[in-house]
C-alpha cells in the first residue's frame, strides 16, 4: 500500500512538470488492468477445471461403490442358497458320503469367498482413503479458489482506490504552487545531507578506532620483537662464552694429559713397569720418612684415583669380603 501511495505521489510530481508523463499514465493503468484481468481469467479457468475433476472422481467412486455392493449381495445370496441346499441334503442318509464331499467343497468355496470378500473390503478401504485424499485436495483447492477470489476483490478495490486517488490528485494538482514544491525539495535535500553527514561521522569514528587499535597492536608486536631479540642476543653471548670455556677446558685437559705422559714413576712390587707419580706423595729430602710416619688416608679417594699398589690392596680386601661375608 505504501509503495502504491509513494508511486502515486511521484507520478503526480512528474505530471506537474511535463505533459508527456500525463499521456503515459493512462497506458500504464491500462496495462495494469489488462494484467489483472488475465490473472482473474486464469484463476477462473483453474477453478472450473478443479470442479470438473472433483465431479469426475465423485461419479467414479459412486459407480465403484454400487458395483461392490452388488457383488457382496450376490455372494451373500449364493451363500444362503448353498446353506439351504446343504440343509436339505443332510436329511438323506444314503448320500452322506457325497454330503461330506460337498461339505468340504462348500467349505473351500466359503474360504475362497471369504478371502475374496476380504480383498474387496481392503480395496474398498483403499478407495475410501483415496476418496478422503481427493476430498482433502478438493477442500484445499476450494480454499485456494476462495483466496483467489479474495485477492481478485482486493485487486479490484485497490484499482478503484487508485483510480479515485489518481482522479483526486489530477483534480488538486493545479492548486500546488511552484514555491511550495521548491521548498519541499530544498527541505528534503537538507534532510538527506544531514543524514549523510551523520553516516559519514559514524564511519570516520569507526575508521579512527580501527586505526588506533591497529597502531597499538603494531607497537605491542614491535616491543615483543625487541624483547625477543634481546633474549636471543643474551642467549647467543652465553652460548659463545660457554663454547670458549669448553675449548679452554679441552686445551687444559690436553695439556695435563701431555704432562702426565711425560711423568714416570720408579718400579714397585706391583709388577708394573711404569708408575704415575702420586700427586699426594711428597717429594724432596725427608719426604719418605714423613710418609711412613704419616701414611695418607685413602678412605676418601675413589678407587680409580688410588695408587696402583693401594688399588691392589683394596681389590684384595674386597675379594676377601666377598668370600667371607
UniProtKB/Swiss-Prot annotation:
Disulfide bonds: none annotated. InterPro entries: CC2-LZ_dom (IPR032419). GO terms for cellular component: cytosol. The gene is TNIP3. The keyword Coiled coil applies. Pfam families: CC2-LZ. Highly expressed in lung, lymph node, thymus and fetal liver. Expressed at lower levels in bone marrow, brain, kidney, spleen, leukocytes and tonsils. Could be detected in heart, salivary gland, adrenal gland, pancreas, ovary and fetal brain. High levels detected in liver, colon, small intestine, muscle, stomach, testis, placenta, thyroid, uterus, prostate, skin and PBL. Residues 1-30, 84-129 are annotated as: Disordered. Residues 27-265 form a coiled coil. Binds to zinc finger protein TNFAIP3 and inhibits NF-kappa-B activation induced by tumor necrosis factor, Toll-like receptor 4 (TLR4), interleukin-1 and 12-O-tetradecanoylphorbol-13-acetate. Overexpression inhibits NF-kappa-B-dependent gene expression in response to lipopolysaccharide at a level downstream of TRAF6 and upstream of IKBKB. NF-kappa-B inhibition is independent of TNFAIP3 binding. One of its GO terms (biological process) is MyD88-independent toll-like receptor signaling pathway. The keyword Manganese does not apply. Keywords: Coiled coil, Inflammatory response. This is TNFAIP3-interacting protein 3. It comes from Homo sapiens. Residues 190-248 are annotated as: Ubiquitin-binding domain (UBD). Residues 17-28 have a biased composition (Basic and acidic residues). It comes from the Eukaryota. Interacts with TNFAIP3. Interacts with polyubiquitin. Induction: By Listeria infection. Expression is slightly down-regulated by dexamethasone and slightly up-regulated by IL-10. Strongly induced mRNA and protein expression by lipopolysaccharide. GO terms for molecular function: polyubiquitin modification-dependent protein binding.
Amino acid at each position: 500500500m505504501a509503495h502504491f501511495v509513494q508511486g502515486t505521489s511521484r507520478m503526480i510530481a512528474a505530471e506537474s512538470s511535463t505533459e508527456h508523463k500525463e499521456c503515459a499514465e493512462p497506458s500504464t493503468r491500462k496495462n495494469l488492468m489488462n494484467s489483472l484481468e488475465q490473472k482473474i481469467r486464469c484463476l477462473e479457468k483453474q477453478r472450473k477445471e478443479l470442479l470438473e475433476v472433483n465431479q469426475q472422481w465423485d461419479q467414479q467412486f459412486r459407480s465403484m461403490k454400487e458395483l461392490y455392493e452388488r457383488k457382496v449381495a450376490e455372494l451373500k445370496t449364493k451363500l444362503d442358497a448353498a446353506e439351504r441346499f446343504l440343509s436339505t441334503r443332510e436329511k438323506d442318509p444314503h448320500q452322506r458320503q457325497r454330503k461330506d464331499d460337498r461339505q468340504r467343497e462348500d467349505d473351500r468355496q466359503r474360504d475362497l469367498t471369504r478371502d475374496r470378500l476380504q480383498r474387496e473390503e481392503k480395496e474398498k478401504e483403499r478407495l475410501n482413503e483415496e476418496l478422503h485424499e481427493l476430498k482433502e485436495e478438493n477442500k484445499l483447492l476450494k480454499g485456494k479458489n476462495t483466496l483467489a477470489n479474495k485477492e481478485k476483490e482486493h485487486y479490484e478495490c485497490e484499482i478503484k482506490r487508485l483510480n479515485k486517488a489518481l482522479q483526486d490528485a489530477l483534480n488538486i494538482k493545479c492548486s500546488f504552487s511552484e514555491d511550495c514544491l521548491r521548498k519541499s525539495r530544498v527541505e528534503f535535500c537538507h534532510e538527506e545531507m544531514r543524514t549523510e553527514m551523520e553516516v559519514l561521522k559514524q564511519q570516520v569514528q569507526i575508521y579512527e578506532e580501527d586505526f588506533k587499535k591497529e597502531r597499538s597492536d603494531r607497537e605491542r608486536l614491535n616491543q615483543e620483537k625487541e624483547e625477543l631479540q634481546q633474549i636471543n642476543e643474551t642467549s647467543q653471548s652465553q652460548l659463545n662464552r660457554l663454547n670458549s670455556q669448553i675449548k679452554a677446558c679441552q686445551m687444559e685437559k690436553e695439556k695435563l694429559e701431555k704432562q702426565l705422559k711425560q711423568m714416570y714413576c720408579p718400579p714397585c712390587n706391583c709388577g708394573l713397569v711404569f708408575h704415575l707419580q702420586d700427586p699426594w706423595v711428597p717429594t724432596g729430602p725427608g719426604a719418605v720418612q714423613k710418609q711412613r710416619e704419616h701414611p695418607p688416608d685413602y678412605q676418601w679417594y675413589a678407587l680409580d684415583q688410588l695408587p696402583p699398589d693401594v688399588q691392589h690392596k683394596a681389590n684384595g680386601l674386597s675379594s676377601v669380603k666377598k668370600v667371607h661375608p
